[in-house]
């Protein structure tokens, strides 16, 4: 099974099942969270579940998608090396990564013993570069011998199961310092492939969206679980709540003025935003509801 097969295979899995599984799994204890918060850091780049895993750089014959993840931990964030055209285009990059996209050299890398990478002080034939067309922390370029990859941001490092990160920090990953750095906001289907409705490009609406989202309070996983699911009387009722919450998921694509794209989710019936790579949740207030009703419904 090559990396393209893995991509197609995961896209054929029912997204509702994956979303429900993820919502429930976030209530597990710390060791499970720390393991999968890193390993599964980008699956939301392929299918619509909340924990981020890419698995887009696996060797042929590799039957285990976990071992096919070309992950990199860098500056307190998790990334994955990607070369599948459909995925690159989904995130606003050209369908093929080439040498001319490599900017300033940042690090030499080495294999981490699997499909992933780690930084090294020694000179190697694997290098990490800035992405020249749009210098930011959301995208880097990786050269592994003669092969070039995009290295896409997946999520912030999680110190424990209640680590929380503000949306301001997610925006900064893509060099968004104000609403002027956002080109459009678009609702997408669960696979993040088809636009739903018309992209929001009105400057006033984008300014309001940015201002409201950076002001929202951030909840780590443990606090979110308590707020959302602790009031149910038994396990069966709680499981039904998890399913209903997952079924309510909708996706927003944010595109920067440089053309880079990333995604966050929202659950309007339950008043929550799923902060994507922040691995955090945000309570939707009345103003945010009004913006959603005005622009996305």
Predicted segments with their positions:
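Generic structural microfeature
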Residues: 1, 5, 35, 40-41, ...
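Disordered, charged N-terminal biogenesis/targeting segments of membrane/secreted proteins
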Residues: 1-29
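Single-pass transmembrane signal-anchor helices and their membrane-water interface zones
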Residues: 10, 35-60
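Short linear functional motifs in flexible/disordered or boundary regions
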Residues: 18-22, 52, 221
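Short helix-adjacent coil turns
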Residues: 20-21, 37, 41, 76
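Loop-to-transmembrane-helix entry motif
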Residues: 28-31, 37
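Function-determining sites in protein domains
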Residues: 59-297
């Amino acid at each position: 099974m090559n990396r393209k097969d893995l991509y197609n295979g995961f896209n054929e899995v029912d997204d509702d099942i994956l979303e429900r599984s993820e919502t429930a799994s976030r209530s597990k204890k710390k060791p499970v969270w720390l393991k999968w918060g890193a390993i599964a850091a980008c699956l939301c780049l392929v299918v619509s579940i909340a924990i981020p895993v890419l698995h887009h750089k696996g060797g042929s014959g590799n039957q285990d998608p976990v071992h096919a993840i070309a992950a990199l931990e860098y500056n307190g964030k998790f990334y994955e090396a990607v070369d599948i055209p459909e995925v690159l285009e989904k995130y606003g990059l050209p369908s093929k990564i080439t040498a001319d996209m490599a900017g300033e050299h940042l690090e030499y890398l080495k294999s981490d013993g699997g499909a992933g990478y780690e930084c090294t002080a020694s000179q190697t034939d694997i290098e990490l570069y800035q992405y020249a067309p749009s210098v930011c922390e959301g995208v880097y370029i990786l050269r592994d011998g003669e092969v070039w990859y995009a290295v896409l941001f997946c999520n912030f490092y999680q110190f424990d199961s209640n680590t929380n990160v503000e949306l301001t920090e997610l925006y900064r990953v893509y060099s968004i310092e104000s609403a002027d750095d956002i080109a459009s906001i678009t609702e997408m289907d669960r696979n993040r492939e088809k636009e739903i409705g018309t992209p929001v490009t009105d400057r006033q609406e984008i300014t309001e969206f940015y201002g409201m989202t950076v002001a929202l309070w951030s909840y780590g996983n443990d606090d979110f679980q308590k707020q959302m699911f602790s009031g149910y009387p038994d396990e069966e009722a709680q499981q039904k709540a998890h399913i209903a919450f997952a079924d309510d998921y909708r996706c927003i694509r944010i595109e920067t003025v440089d053309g880079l794209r990333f995604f966050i989710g929202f659950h309007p019936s339950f008043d929550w935003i799923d902060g994507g790579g922040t691995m955090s949740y945000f309570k939707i207030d009345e103003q945010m509801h009004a913006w959603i009703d005005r622009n996305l419904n």
